[in-house]
């Protein structure tokens, strides 16, 4: 299994210090699971991190989950393993007026899936649950449209040239935009991918919820009415949006 660590690290374009940190965390991970992957071993590894600070634990989760995804991608494992415990940092609620440096979201990244997830939330206000069910047949690259069917509501959204570029370049599945052997990835996978990207660009205090809040505030600032935004988000009622329009 050690050789797979080196192959994984060789596939990354990261600084020497980050490389050393990845290598240390992964060697420690293999030692603690006795070089044998199983759900039970992963649970034991997660418990071994309980004494660490939230930020240190979050870093190790990200590193190990990237490695586990790599093992699955190169067919070392016959199923997708992941650390499933959610790591929460101390609450640092981002105010509605938080100014994002948008350029960071569009720069080249080591986490293209996480980047696309972030952009689809920030630009279109989509939920991770909606992204997980998004089928390729619902994406029209020629007209730059995405159809989102939530069962009770259907919305058709136009997307930017930047998202078109990412969609065109991204390796996608055969059925879903984000796919694991023909099936949607888990919610934890979306959390991990988004978190890894946000950590990379220096916005690890953000979340899917705060990115969606930024979308809502930007729509309001563009002059989108409360009812128009309610429809755009596919909500049955504007109640949850009213607080943003009181700002």
From Swiss-Prot:
One annotated GO molecular function: DNA binding
Localization annotation: Cytoplasm
Principal cellular location given in the protein's record: cytoplasm
UniProt keywords, alphabetically: Cytoplasm, DNA integration, DNA recombination, DNA-binding
InterPro entries in the record: CB (IPR044068), DNA_brk_join_enz (IPR011010), Integrase-like_cat_sf (IPR013762), Integrase_catalytic (IPR002104), Integrase_recombinase_N (IPR010998), Integrase_SAM-like_N (IPR004107), Tyrosine_recombinase_XerD-like (IPR020876)
Residue ranges annotated for the Tyr recombinase domain, each copy included: 91-247
SUPFAM superfamilies per UniProt: DNA breaking-rejoining enzymes
Any one GO biological process: DNA transposition
Active site: 212, 244
Protein name: Tyrosine recombinase XerD-like
Species name: Streptococcus uberis (strain ATCC BAA-854 / 0140J)
UniProt lineage: Bacteria, Bacillati, Bacillota, Bacilli, Lactobacillales
């Amino acid at each position: 299994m050690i050789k797979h660590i080196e192959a994984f690290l060789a596939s990354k374009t990261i600084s020497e210090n980050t490389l050393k940190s990845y290598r240390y965390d992964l060697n420690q991970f293999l030692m603690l699971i006795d070089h044998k992957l199983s759900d039970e071993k992963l649970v034991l590894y997660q418990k071994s991190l309980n004494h660490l600070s939230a930020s240190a634990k979050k870093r190790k989760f990200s590193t190990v989950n990237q490695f586990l995804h790599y093992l699955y991608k190169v067919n070392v494992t016959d199923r997708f393993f992941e650390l499933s415990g959610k790591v929460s940092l101390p609450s640092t609620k981002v105010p509605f007026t938080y100014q994002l440096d948008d350029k960071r979201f569009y720069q080249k990244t080591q986490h293209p899936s996480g980047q696309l997830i972030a952009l689809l939330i920030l630009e279109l206000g989509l939920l991770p649950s909606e992204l997980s069910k998004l089928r390729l047949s619902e994406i029209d690259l020629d007209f730059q449209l995405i159809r989102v069917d939530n069962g009770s509501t259907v919305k058709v959204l136009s997307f930017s040239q930047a998202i078109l570029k990412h969609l065109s370049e991204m390796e996608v599945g055969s059925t879903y935009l984000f796919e694991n052997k023909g099936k949607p990835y888990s919610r934890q996978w979306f959390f991990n991918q988004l978190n890894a990207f946000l950590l990379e660009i220096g916005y690890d205090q953000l979340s899917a919820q705060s990115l969606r809040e930024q979308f809502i505030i930007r729509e309001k600032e563009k002059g989108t009415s409360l009812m128009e935004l309610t429809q755009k988000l596919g909500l049955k009622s504007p109640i949850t949006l009213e607080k943003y329009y009181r700002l």
